[in-house]
From Swiss-Prot:
Keyword Transferase recorded: yes
InterPro entries to which the protein is assigned, alphabetical: AceGlu_kinase-like_sf, Asp/Glu/Uridylate_kinase, Uridylate_kinase, Uridylate_kinase_bac
Source organism: Burkholderia ambifaria (strain ATCC BAA-244 / DSM 16087 / CCUG 44356 / LMG 19182 / AMMD)
Main location group: cytoplasm
GO MF term (any one): UMP kinase activity
A GO term from the CC aspect: cytosol
Activity regulation info: Inhibited by UTP.
An individual GO BP term: UDP biosynthetic process
Pathway: Pyrimidine metabolism; CTP biosynthesis via de novo pathway; UDP from UMP (UMPK route): step 1/1
Protein name: Uridylate kinase
Binding residues for ATP: K11, L12, S13, G14, G54, R58, T161, Y167, D170
The protein's assembly and partners: Homohexamer.
Amino acid sequence: MSNAYKRVLLKLSGEALMGDDAFGINRATIERMVADIAEVVGLGTQLAVVIGGGNIFRGVAGGAAGMDRATADYMGMLATMMNALALQDAMRHAGIVARVQSALRMDQVVEPYIRPRAIRQLEEGKVVIFAAGTGNPFFTTDTAAALRGSEVGAEVVLKATKVDGVYSADPKKDPSATRYATISFDEAISRNLQVMDATAFALCRDQKLPIRVFSINKPGALKRIVLGEDEGTLVHV
């Protein structure tokens, strides 16, 4: 079976790295994620990753109460850097060549984000991990995923979550909630379905960049998506 996508951008939340822990990075969880990523890389699909920082610090969370919002957001960006380095290290142990590019300069640790370099690295079969969000406060890492996905020419943004798609209602609260196999951007907006934050969602819609929402906890889900199988929910124009 041929790959459905040549180049994808995977959005990982920081919380996904916690596993069952209350905080930080769960090594077994990150190794399982990397095993899934290795399968996709082995198929020849070019993979970029945008990673969040919510397992360490969230600029909009309670820990930032009373703090200047921009300062809190910069702290969140530094948290994504820690996650990116952990992910790169786990990939190295799995035999995957990965590069971290940061929207904030930290030259002794990672490369700065340079679009042509990122594209070249993807073409060389390396995984490129984008850290520090957009490099600007007030923008989420979802927006960074939409931005970087558009910049490097990804064919789809794969948003890894704790649920296996977009539902008509919260499946934890409403047992009758149904999963959408596909849904348009406009329909998702009209139904007030929170796929991504408004800025990220609008950017994907304007760039005609589809979003595939899937469960990061479901073994093999990432590979099935790349092979074009029905997995999660596809949000399309």
